[in-house]
């Protein structure tokens, strides 16, 4: 299936000069969604995770069905104040400031093998921070899977060296 035909390019959104890659047509297509989950499943076959970690919020859209399909657990990584109970958090640098991600403190007990899933890899800052958070919380990071990679932003360079990084679609 041609997943690229399910991605809409919207010029000048959210501001002039930006070419936005809209995944909503893909989300509306049961066949395209099934193909994404199938291709992510092949990545799981390679890296053999015990858990899928999804990055807020679109990582949830792809990570939860992948986990269900592969009979794996799913763990959300969220912005501050969104998870109940004790959390482990990590502050990370943005272009203009900082942000924070959190995971429940007991989510990665027993050092599970973790695949991080999200919709988009651009600068890599959020994904890299998620990988650090997984390890800080006791998990064993085994790779990253993205629907789209915007190669011009160099996000792969921000991710840990030696970790598998897979993107189903790449744009320059």
Swiss-Prot record:
Keywords for this protein: Cytoplasm, Glycosyltransferase, Purine salvage, Transferase
Subcellular localization(s) per the UniProt record: Cytoplasm
KW Cytoplasm (keyword) present: yes
Q: Its catalytic activity?
A: AMP + diphosphate = 5-phospho-alpha-D-ribose 1-diphosphate + adenine
InterPro entries hit by this protein = Ade_phspho_trans, PRibTrfase_dom, PRTase-like, UPRTase/APRTase
Give the signal peptide as a residue range, or say none if absent. Answer: none
Q: Which Gene3D superfamilies match?
A: 3.40.50.2020
Q: Can you list the GO cellular component terms from the UniProt entry?
A: cytoplasm
Superkingdom classification of source: Bacteria
Class of enzymatic activity (EC top level): transferase
Any GO MF annotation of the entry: adenine binding
For biological process, the GO terms are:
adenine salvage; AMP salvage; purine ribonucleoside salvage
Membrane among keywords: no
PROSITE patterns cross-referenced by the UniProt entry: PUR_PYR_PR_TRANSFER (PS00103)
Q: Which EC number(s) does UniProt give?
A: 2.4.2.7
Named in its record, the pathway it takes part in is: Purine metabolism; AMP biosynthesis via salvage pathway; AMP from adenine: step 1/1
**Pfam family example for this protein?**
Pribosyltran
Task: Give the family per the record.
Answer: Belongs to the purine/pyrimidine phosphoribosyltransferase family.
User: Quaternary form?
Assistant: Homodimer.
Q: What role is this protein assigned?
A: Catalyzes a salvage reaction resulting in the formation of AMP, that is energically less costly than de novo synthesis.
What name goes with this protein? Adenine phosphoribosyltransferase
